């Protein structure tokens, strides 16, 4: 019974994890953070063209081997009528929140972000302090 559970664990957890790690190791990654692409992924429209309030939550895989397991996430806010987005993210445990450290929809360590959640209009305005 124990051997079957161990085999089941290996098949259902370790095999997919190893496969993903192998795939990830073959991806073209920057050697270090200085060489990574941090530019905008052009996922957001120009802030001036959006008249309503918006809140976006983005996530992108982190750099090097940690990208197998982890994502970096951040929140982008734009008040109604604002001419620019404001990005909030935390880099490192226990560090303060960074404001506009990177492009609102910028890549993270060369990895394109994905939109996790979006709130627009009056609902977004109610959530923005």
What do these predicted regions represent?
Residues 28-42, 48-122:
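Glycine-rich catalytic cores of cysteine/serine-nucleophile enzymes that process amide/ester linkages
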Residues 121-129:
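A structural motif
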